[in-house]
UniProtKB/Swiss-Prot annotation:
Species of provenance: Salinispora arenicola (strain CNS-205)
Region (Disordered): 209-288
Gene Ontology CC: one annotated term: cytosolic small ribosomal subunit
Keywords of the record: Ribonucleoprotein, Ribosomal protein, RNA-binding, rRNA-binding
Polar residues: bias regions: 277-288
HAMAP family in alphabetical order: Ribosomal_uS3_B
Ranges annotated as biased composition (Low complexity): 249-264
Protein name in the entry: Small ribosomal subunit protein uS3
Domain KH type-2: 38-106
Amino acid sequence: MGQKVHPHGFRLGISTDWKSRWFADKLYKDYIGEDVKIRRMMSKGLERAGISKVDIERTRDRVRVDIHTARPGIVIGRKGAEADRIRGKLEKLTGKQVQLNIIEVKSPESDAQLVAQGVAEQLSSRVSFRRAMRKAMQSAMKNPVCKGIRVQVSGRLGGAEMSRTEFYREGRVPLHTLRANIEYGFFEARTTFGRIGVKVWIYKGDAVPGRETPAEAPSRPRRERGDRSERPRRGRSGSSGTTAGGTEAGRAAATTIAQAAETPSGEPVDADAVASAATQPAETQQEG
């Protein structure tokens, strides 16, 4: 069976950007570990904030952390108390000065990660998985930016003994198109029957401008009759395989038949003359 590659990593440098932007030589593994710990701390401590993604950018003596959230009030807290607490924990973890930026997600219903979290929360609240999936898809498709969505859940759905995978799709979700802007989100729902994984793909149109799709490619201009070359054709003319002589013979036969039809009904028509005129090729008037 073919497996699906991660849509974000598949399109890095084409339609998506890196979530961690820094360069390191000997400290590469240390920075990677710090990034993992920072994102893990954001996901565990702020479940109700609806965090979509965390971007990390490093300089020599400073770390910049951008938190994209649907509920910035929860992250900021009363008079900025929660933001100060988060900044203090990050400075203790990294040992550098931390610049914390809180960015609000304008349309959370069309964000793949937030949609996956919403479906997982409903599954944890014992809502039917089909109802949760369809409701999330309807809310996402109301946004004109969303061109297509696919929601997939896997696990012991409905408390069944055997785990299975089900998905619903609406619109177009071209996972093999590199220029397609596809957002991907994953979240796990903790239920009494075990964990249920939720995956969401959202297609938001093509992200790479200046490329024409096959449907929009300009067609070749058709030549008019006056634009054709005046050089006389040789051999077979046309796709039907008829020669110039055969065409003239057909015209002569049609003329003979028309004249025969115009004769009075009492006069007999010479059938041999009509047949011989249809089979003999017309003589060309051009000589040597």
